[in-house]
Amino acid sequence: MRKLTVFEMCITAFFAALTAVLTQIAIPIGPVPITLGTFSVFLAGALLGAKLGAVSQAIYVLLGIIGVPVFSSFRAGVGVLFGPTGGYIAGYILAAGLVGFLVKRYGNKFYVIILAMLAGYCAYTFTGTCWYMYSMETGVAEALMVCVVPFIPGDVLKIILAVVLVRRLNPVLQKYLK
């Protein structure tokens, strides 16, 4: 197994911190707030690749579990993961890994990045909505109306902005990432 470079460690930590900061920019609209955290998840996956992207989000989740107030509204602790938003938080790891895998596999083309981010969006939305249904004991229709539909416009905007940034930043970062 290859050792990580100092740059790879730093950029991975940076994306964990970026997710923590952007998650605090939230619009509370019910049990699942609108945050900019997913913007960072998309960027981490597409820019760092599957492994480092997923690791950056795993660091974010682990920081929250051990008590660092990184989750939305400065919450922390394992209890947050067992609450209604826990599936979305855990889904960040899956989404970043999936986005990174798809971009690496199919290239840094505009349409590939969009499709990869849509796949990541579907992955974390699926895990989050399933967990919400379980933890809140609701049905599919109610969960979709509470957890998915209100977020679609904002998530589409985040994906568009992330794609633009990735297209600009990827050529620069790839010089330093192996």
Question: Residues of each region from the PLM?
Answer:
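Interfacial aromatic-anchored transmembrane helix boundaries in multi-pass membrane proteins
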Residues: 23-33, 61-95
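Short helix-perturbing small/polar motifs within transmembrane alpha-helices
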Residues: 14, 21, 78-122
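Membrane-helix interface segments
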Residues: 5, 50-55, 106-112, 139-140
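Alpha-helical transmembrane segments of integral membrane proteins
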Residues: 6-15, 37, 55-56, 87, ...
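Interfacial helix-loop-helix junctions of multi-pass membrane proteins
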Residues: 68-74, 131-145
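Generic alpha-helical transmembrane segments of integral inner-membrane proteins
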Residues: 13, 17, 21, 43, ...
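Alpha-helical transmembrane segments and their cytosolic interface
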Residues: 1-13, 146-178
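Hydrophobic transmembrane alpha-helices
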Residues: 1-54
